[in-house]
Amino acid sequence: MASPPAHRSSKAADEELPKASSTFHPSLWGSFFLTYQPPTAPQRANMKERAEVLRERVRKVLKGSTTDQLPETVNLILTLQRLGLGYYYENEIDKLLHQIYSNSDYNEKDLNLVSQRFYLLRKNGYDVPSDVFLNFKTEEGGFACAAADTRSLLSLYNAAYLRKHGEEVLDEAISSTRLRLQDLLGRLLPESPFAKEVSSSLRTPLFRRVGILEARNYIPIYEKEATRNEAVLELAKLNFNLQQLDFCEELKHCSAWWNEMIAKSKLTFVRDRIVEEYFWMNGACCDPPYSLSRIILTKITGLITIIDDMFDTHGTTEDCMKFAEAFGRWDESAIHLLPEYMKDFYILMLETFQSFEDALGPEKSYRVLYLKQAMERLVELYSKEIKWRDQDYVATMSEHLQVSAESIGANALTCSAYAGMGDMSITKETFEWALSFPQFIRTFGSFVRLSNDVVSTKREQTKDHSPSTVHCYMKEHGTTMDDACEKIKELIEDSWKDMLEQSLALKGLPKVVPQLVFDFSRTTDNMYRDRDALTSSEALKEMIQLLFVEPIPE
């Protein structure tokens, strides 16, 4: 939840809608996705048939890979994962990863291989040691890498971002290689594939990129590589285009739901960002089986946006407290507690949750109960933040994050995603673990909160608001806003290390659980790096076009 404004006393009658004080720009997409027309059934069937043939051709290549050809095997797995194809070969990849981890008989003097092996294993949950990079340290403190060996330099840079606290060799690798890559970039042809890879890595290290966006951007780069596998390339293009069809149908459904929600509730003051919210959630759950997760996530994010804007900008304290009381009842009879302008929204919200139960069916509808609990907790915390606001209370950073790391919606998002997954490894125990707000999810929540605050605080100077984490740090440590923002950026960087350490220590949970949290972190980083792209969504327009509007030429 963004920082709320100072308290305004309520003198309006229940029937009056609070006046909008925001200047949110209108949707950039209007009814664009509502008019989407899918290809004919025969066209789609033909695409799926071709994709299945190609998947089996690639599977044969993967099954023929061994650790005896370690560089080729590691590179193939990395390529498949970057192209968004890893999902189809999870069993084969898991088997190869175990062999790669168990086999220590490889050339430890090959910096590119060492870096790619380290990256691949840590990314996939293996806690391999970083001291293997000590072999490449020079007396001057740099890393031994021939000037012409640019690929190894880039691999080392990307591998080093899978670092934990105290791994000085990886901290030094980032500092050293970044300078060399920046210098190298100035000497490369700007349109060359390798220049694009270097530029992308300097902006966003490979581990932190949104998977579906990386696939879309990497396909044309891979197409120009001399060592490309034609079957892999053709499959990557076809697979992306098939996914895009699914995404557009889901966007059409979510857009129709949103338009009905706003039209019937008459809450026209809220941010109209359903396309951007789908884009955001898609980045966390892009694999083919997770269609229902994407839909539930998008609708939950839309509901949170409405509630956030009511609490944040438009609702009086009295009205918001009435809403909080009614919220936990989950019953139409509670509308008598609400001011008139909230009643239709409340009913529509109940209908939305009922639709989740219907979609999940009798065996999995229990999951919605956990999702409701997560939302109840969210609204409870919004109410606490309003009380802080009204008291002009400035918490310490630690106290603020105890509340705001949770009120940012981390539990609601993770439970929404788990709820829609067909994977039967997601059990009641998974939800109970998530709702206990364990340290791993708390760290993720802190990451989202800090990422949001560091880009929104200056914008919120234009209106009354309660303190963000930036203001809390400024008061607690007596610093300027710029200094506080720099410190919070350091804390954000530390959060990546914390999440990696905590994920490697998780036991007894489905593999998708930590993967999902990292995917949420990646897509959140994309939303909040340098700007609040949800509120000012022009920054996302090109990315949305790439994912949902422009198919890849085959």
Swiss-Prot record:
GO terms assigned for molecular function: endo-alpha-bergamotene synthase activity; gamma-curcumene synthase activity; magnesium ion binding; sesquithujene synthase activity; terpene synthase activity
Biological pathway: Secondary metabolite biosynthesis; terpenoid biosynthesis
PANTHER family attached to this UniProt entry: INACTIVE SESQUITHUJENE SYNTHASE (PTHR31225:SF168), OS04G0344100 PROTEIN-RELATED (PTHR31225)
Catalytic activity: (2E,6E)-farnesyl diphosphate = sesquithujene + diphosphate; (2Z,6Z)-farnesyl diphosphate = (1S,5S,6S)-alpha-bergamotene + diphosphate; (2E,6E)-farnesyl diphosphate = (E)-beta-farnesene + diphosphate; (2E,6E)-farnesyl diphosphate = (S)-beta-bisabolene + diphosphate
Originating gene: TPS5A
Tissues where the protein occurs: Highly expressed in the husk. Detected in leaves.
Protein name per the record: Sesquithujene synthase A
Mutagenesis / variant outcome for changing G409A: Altered product specificity and production of mostly (S)-beta-bisabolene. Formation of 7-epi-sesquithujene and sesquisabinene A. Production of (S)-beta-bisabolene and 7-epi-sesquithujene
Membrane spanning stretches: none
Locations listed in the record: Cytoplasm
Residues reported in the UniProt entry to bind Mg(2+) 2: D308, D312
Motif DDXXD motif boundaries: 308-312
Cited SUPFAM superfamilies: Terpenoid cyclases/Protein prenyltransferases, Terpenoid synthases
Domain notes from UniProt: The Asp-Asp-Xaa-Xaa-Asp/Glu (DDXXD/E) motif is important for the catalytic activity, presumably through binding to Mg(2+).
